[in-house]
Curated annotation (Swiss-Prot):
The active site is at residues 718, 720, 797, 799. Residues 171-245, 429-555 are annotated as: N7-methyltransferase activity. This is Protein VP3. GO terms for biological process: symbiont-mediated suppression of host innate immune response; viral process. It is found in: Virion. InterPro entries: VP3_Rotav. Contains a bipartite N7-methyltransferase domain, a 2'-O-methyltransferase domain and a GTase/RTPase domain. The C-terminus contains a phosphodiesterase domain that degrades the 5'-triphosphorylated, 2'-5' linked adenylate oligomers produced by the host cell in response to IFN stimulation. Transmembrane segments: none annotated. GO terms for molecular function: GTP binding; hydrolase activity; mRNA 5'-cap (guanine-N7-)-methyltransferase activity; mRNA guanylyltransferase activity; RNA binding.
Length: 835
């Protein structure tokens, strides 16, 4: 949902939009809670409170102040990610298709012939890093830029088996127009940038597990971050290959040679970062014009020095000349060298050209060895061709996508590699590598071992759920890693499947109860965003590709109502109750009936079950930003930090009742996952709360009324307001609590409206209006370790007779309290009080 804050109402009516006017009788937290549970996507918030907007944004719900109609129109028609700290709106708006254009934020694409293969009459637009160049389109009171681009489709095309780009991009545009927006992918780049800047400033050692190409710009400015990936393809790994011949295959209609060069250099750069944790000088020989340097400089202040007879406009220092082996002495330590020398074929015949290529390959390799033979802190990436070669066994092979697969590949070496054992590699083996291997990632660092790191902050986004990881080891890492942000795939199957298929792999599935964490926040993507200064206009949908975000070591853990809080907890319930169910009271009715409470009069205002816990369980697929386990734990230890709101602390027994209702719901829905989740949450409640039951009571609290509107034959009809199992020495403690609650007890609006047979020969009258106070009293006794209440649900009633009687219904009648007392069962009254 998105909340657009206005000072005045607007005349225009918008689809899927609701107006909420700030309620001055409620505080900011209560207003935020009410807004978050509205069911429409767009909320126009009138007479708004800035504090309420802050609360919503911290909860991951985008809430933006609107000053002009243009702002309203722009934000209401598309989704966005909002940086509420720096007041920047990142639109995810593809309406630019109506201008017959596709967009890119990679400058090199604009220097290709891609426009020859676009849809007729279409053009390509460059919009800068995260759409930064579009800011001029929006003259708003907040910074605004459109971060939506088609780079995902362009890159997918490059790695696909499709050659016809026009057909491919047409299909992708149609897909985008007919399926829900993958907003997490769009928003993720904004999130990653913010996340790692924050972590690097707060932690001296940060580890990142499983980065992919979409992060290749994110980490350019963070050389200290240790990366773990799937490891490199080494020269020695070619021993498994059979020999093949030249294949020759076109991968792309438009020229992607610059993209290949960029990937080669960035792969080399991240190898350098992995070894030396600082920024090097980047030397490049050949590969002009290297327009992609402009893209790199949008993210980092890396320095480039280049050699090529052709211009390289974005180089910091360009030498418009050839580079020779003798020039290696000009290169400094703490650097990387990219050697991409290859002359044009022009009119040379094949044999002559092949001889030139092999000579240049040998020359390139000689330059690389000479560069690595002296000095320190050096890594080299060199252009090679398939030919009989001796190569260091530990050198890394690269074959990033290029326009045509021919005979070229690349080799990365560091100083140690260059001096390592060499192995003869036949030309046919190298052709086999080229023909069958595409390097898919610029991150080729070693795989992560699932073990706790003592002094590091571990980030593992979408990296650990794969079933090639041992599931128990993943759980152990989450439980024991002190500082971390780890994601795992949430189990939102209905059959409690332990793993699910995704693309061509399988992922383990998890529930929050799979982890034993006491100082970690377990939330959703949008819940996590709120903790890093971001919010989003479109909440996660239960697509099957959803993840739990687990934050360990965060200073926000105790701020229960500020982050990963109960905002939107009833939203799915409201959507169902007011559109699909038998009655808008269905949830209240079901919760009472499933706990054998058949008095449904006033069930919507006097319910014996925690609605928060019930909704968090049965609708967890729709809203798991609310960290239920943390909410339970902090209340059980009395450590919850509550900033505001009409906050009601549930008695532990109300939580138990909610689990039982959710379990009943799951059985009716044949939802095995909710069934397990409900059982495990109930077990967790029993673990963190020391709940004892007065199933063999020796005292009870009684309430005698001045008027009973029914016939009765018991000596003193009364309401048993709970039973206790206590020693006589604890009586003063019980009395002290009763005295503390005196005013609230006598203020109860107690009513009755019918009689019924509680069981055979037990004739009783119903009592309404006491449950809220009963559970508050329960909590007070629990905190003093006084056993109060039974394991079965408390159903307030007045016993009228121990014989079978005819049921009577009357109008709702108020019962006036005469006095309240504490009495020993089969004994004397030890305390009483009157108003």
């Amino acid at each position: 949902m998105k909340v657009l804050a206005l000072r005045h109402s607007v005349a225009q009516v918008y689809a899927d939009t609701q107006i909420y006017t700030h309620d001055e009788t409620k505080d900011d937290y209560e207003n935020a809670f009410l807004i978050s549970n509205l069911t429409t996507h767009n909320i126009l918030y009138l007479n708004y409170s800035v504090k309420t907007l802050q609360i919503l944004n911290k909860s991951g719900i985008a809430a933006v102040e609107i000053q002009k109609m243009d702002e309203l129109f722009t934000l209401i028609r598309c989704n966005f990610t909002y940086d509420y700290i720096d007041d920047i709106v990142y639109l995810h708006d593809y309406s630019y298709y109506t201008n017959n254009e596709i967009r890119t934020d990679q400058h090199w694409v604009t220097k290709t012939n891609i426009e020859d293969y676009l849809l007729p009459g279409w053009k390509l637009m460059y919009v800068g890093y995260n759409g930064n160049d579009t800011r001029g389109h929006y003259n708003f009171s907040f910074k605004c830029q459109n971060a939506a681009t088609d780079d995902d489709a362009i890159i997918e095309y490059i790695y696909s088996n499709e050659l016809d780009f026009q057909n491919f991009i047409l299909k992708k545009i149609k897909e985008r127009m007919t399926t829900s927006l993958p907003i997490a992918r769009l928003s993720n780049r904004v999130f990653r940038d913010k996340l790692f800047k924050t972590l690097v400033s707060d932690h001296s050692r940060v580890v990142n597990v499983g980065p992919r190409n979409e992060s290749m710009f994110t980490f350019l400015d963070h050389p200290s971050i240790k990366q773990f990936s799937n490891g490199p393809y080494l020269v020695k790994d070619t021993i498994k290959l059979k020999q093949e011949r030249w294949l020759g295959k076109r991968l792309s209609q438009f020229d992607i040679g610059q993209y290949k060069n960029m990937l080669n250099v960035l792969t080399t750069l991240y190898q350098y970062y992995d070894m030396y944790h600082e920024k090097p000088i980047i030397y490049m020989v050949g590969s002009a014009p290297s327009y992609w340097i402009h893209d790199v400089k949008q993210y980092s202040d890396l320095k480039f020095e280049t050699w090529d007879p052709l211009d390289t406009p974005y180089s910091d220092l360009h030498h418009k000349e050839l580079f020779y082996a003798s020039d290696v002495t000009k290169l400094k330590d703490n650097s990387i060298l990219y050697v991409d020398i290859r002359t044009d074929r022009e009119n040379a015949d094949w044999k002559t050209w092949r001889k030139i290529v092999e000579e240049q390959t040998a020359n390139n390799l000689n330059i690389a060895y000479k560069y690595l033979s002296t000095g320190k802190a050096k890594v080299c990436c060199v252009k090679m061709t398939a030919m009989d070669l001796e190569l260091p066994i530990s050198a890394k092979l690269l074959h990033h996508p290029t326009t045509e697969i021919r005979s070229e590949f690349y080799l990365i070496m560091d100083i140690w590699d260059s001096k390592n054992t060499k192995r003869f590699i036949p030309k046919g083996v190298l052709y086999s590598y080229i023909n069958n291997t595409i390097t898919e990632n610029v991150f080729i660092q070693q795989p992560f071992k699932l073990r706790t790191l003592r002094n590091e902050y571990v980030v593992a986004l979408y990296a650990l759920s794969n079933d090639f990881n041992n599931r128990e080891d993943v759980v152990k890492l989450v439980n024991n890693q002190k500082n971390a942000l780890i994601t795992v795939r949430i189990n939102n199957t209905f059959k409690d499947e332990p793993k699910v298929g995704f693309k061509d792999i399988y992922d383990w599935t998890f529930l929050p109860t799979d982890f034993e964490t006491n100082e970690s926040i377990i939330t959703s993507y949008d819940g996590c965003l709120g903790m890093f200064g971001l919010s989003i206009s479109l909440a996660s949908k239960p697509t099957g590709n959803n993840h739990l975000f687990i934050l360990s070591g965060t200073n926000k853990y105790f701020k229960l109502d500020q982050f990963a809080n109960h905002m939107s907890i009833s939203r799915r319930s409201h959507q169902i109750r007011f559109s699909e169910s038998a009655t808008s009271y269905s949830g209240y009715i079901f919760r009472d009936l499933s706990n054998n409470n058949f008095n449904l009069i006033g069930t919507n205002v006097e319910n014996s079950v925690s609605g928060h816990v019930y909704n968090a369980l049965i609708y967890y697929r729709y809203n798991y930003s609310f960290d239920l386990k943390r909410w339970i734990y902090l209340h059980s230890t009395n450590k919850a930090s509550i900033e505001g709101g009409r906050y009601y602390e549930h008695a532990p027994i109300e939580l138990i009742y909610a689990c039982r209702s959710a379990r009943e719901f799951a059985k009716l829905q044949d939802d095995l996952t909710v069934l397990r989740y409900s059982n495990e949450i109930e077990n967790y409640i029993n673990k963190v709360y020391s709940i004892t039951y007065a199933d063999d009571p020796n005292y009870f609290i009684g309430i005698k009324f001045k008027n009973i509107p029914y016939e009765y034959d018991v000596k003193v009809p009364h309401l048993t307001f709970g039973v206790l199992n206590i020693s006589d020495s604890m009586v003063p403690d019980v009395v002290a609590i009763l005295k503390k609650f005196k005013n609230e007890l006598f203020r109860m609006d107690v009513t009755t409206s019918y009689t019924y047979m509680l069981s055979d020969e037990i004739y009783v009258a119903n009592v309404s209006g006491v449950l809220s106070t009963y559970f508050k009293l329960y909590n007070a006794f629990y905190k003093e370790q006084i056993t109060f209440g039974q394991s079965r649900m408390f159903i307030p009633h007045i016993t009228l007779s121990f014989s079978n009687k005819r049921v009577v219904r009357i109008g709702s009648t108020r019962l006036n309290i005469d006095f309240i007392y504490l009495r020993k069962i089969k004994g004397d009254t030890v305390f009483d009080m009157t108003e």
